[in-house]
């Protein structure tokens, strides 16, 4: 499984990348707003830090404008992945852009039908939103499972990028089901390593080591 970090905070991205935990980055208009920076400037900086795909989203709803904005975004760096909404115009833009060799991340996916159409349009990634579905009373993980089955049935190459991930349990369940990628906020990725018994065991080992009076280096 690949880990993408869902943020436009360059400091957080750099920290996680230095740990070897970042395979890519996802951003959206809300994260750009939170960063307080120009989208082109911050996206270019992120692309210079991370070697993997960096998703940057268009802010358009109609095909023609999507294509204009996608052209600007695509020029930022070679590892750019253009992010489009799963709408009819978005699917049309996806088909056109992937035909030109661009990577495309189809976002705001809430149904298996949408995921099927995105794969047919040649999307590089499909981003089903787990947490937002959970908020409506629908189990977001069931959607991941449905998409996995459909993609496996027809050997679609589109990768399932589990998004709107809020908890470490979301990450575990997505991995068990077979999502190709999880994108999560920095805090969630860092929380994956935490377990009380790990820290308790470490405390015991260090206390016993101190009693030996030895040094390794």
UniProtKB/Swiss-Prot annotation:
Keywords annotated in UniProt: Cytoplasm, Pentose shunt, Schiff base, Transferase
Disulfide bonds: none
Localisation per UniProt entry: Cytoplasm
Gene Ontology annotations of biological process type: carbohydrate metabolic process; pentose-phosphate shunt
A single GO molecular function term of this UniProt record: aldehyde-lyase activity
Family the UniProt entry places it in: Belongs to the transaldolase family. Type 3B subfamily.
Function description: Transaldolase is important for the balance of metabolites in the pentose-phosphate pathway.
Entry protein name: Probable transaldolase
Annotated source species: Brucella melitensis biotype 1 (strain ATCC 23456 / CCUG 17765 / NCTC 10094 / 16M)
